[in-house]
């Protein structure tokens, strides 16, 4: 009995020493146009390779692109035997102004342009310089999005009268773990992402109130009872 316990302890210790997970630091500046619910974004991502592997490519999720007629999610929802009743054929019937869109304009690695390809809900990126174990690299991106009519979780103009419900709305780096990359096309299932920190600036019409996770950095400027003092902002826009 004593030998068995000792061996089990050694096995657990060995596993703990070999455990690793990747890490990301996001910085994003978002400008939302509430006249048509489109947004422009700039993203800076610092990716730390804590794995024992050399990384030569990365993938991003572009979830909003699933909300277009003919997408894998649309086809699946219309052809499986037990479809999600919230979806069904609703994506197929969307007008273009109500599509979900997420498109990349440019992408750089450590200041150098790199090759990328949009494959519906997945962005494939070939790194200009391999990312070695223990190293970091900075990926800078310019992108544009369009918020879809709310069908499932995320979208605009829901039945509760909320203009924007934003989930999985930005280009999100896919997970890399001991099994490799997980660039799964989005078909309405669960999400899997990299552990990290986010700094996000959202500029929107100042008549809107933004609710979300995280810590508000400019409480006195925002007002709405967040801070002790309220400083009125000139103009029509406000950055949260």
Show which residues each predicted segment covers.
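Short strand-edge motifs at loop-to-beta-strand transitions and within beta-strands
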Residues: 121-125, 137
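Asparagine-centered strand-capping/turn motif at beta-strand->loop junctions
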Residues: 47-51
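Beta-strand-rich interaction surfaces with strong enrichment in secreted/lumenal proteins
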Residues: 17, 28-30, 45, 112-115, ...
């Amino acid at each position: 009995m004593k030998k068995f316990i000792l061996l089990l302890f050694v096995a657990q210790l060995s596993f703990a020493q070999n455990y690793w997970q990747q890490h990301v630091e996001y910085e994003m500046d978002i400008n939302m146009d509430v006249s048509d619910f489109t947004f422009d974004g700039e993203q800076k991502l610092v990716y730390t390779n804590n794995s024992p592997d050399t990384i030569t490519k990365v993938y991003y999720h572009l979830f909003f692109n699933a909300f277009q007629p003919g997408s894998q999610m649309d086809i699946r929802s219309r052809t499986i035997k037990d479809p999600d009743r919230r979806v069904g054929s609703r994506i197929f019937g969307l007008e273009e102004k109500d599509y979900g869109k997420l498109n990349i304009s440019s992408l750089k690695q450590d200041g150098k342009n790199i090759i990328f390809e949009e494959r519906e809900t997945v962005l494939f990126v070939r790194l200009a310089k391999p990312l070695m174990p223990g190293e970091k690299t900075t990926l800078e991106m310019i992108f544009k999005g369009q918020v879809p009519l709310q069908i499932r979780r995320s979208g605009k103009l829901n039945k509760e009268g909320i203009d924007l419900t934003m989930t999985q709305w930005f280009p999100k780096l896919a997970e890399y773990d001991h099994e490799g990359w997980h660039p799964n096309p989005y078909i309405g299932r669960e999400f899997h992402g990299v552990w990290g920190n986010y700094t996000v600036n959202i500029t929107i019409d100042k008549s809107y109130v933004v609710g979300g996770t995280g810590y508000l950095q400019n409480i006195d400027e925002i007002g709405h009872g967040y801070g002790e003092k309220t400083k009125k902002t000139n103009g029509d826009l406000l950055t949260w």
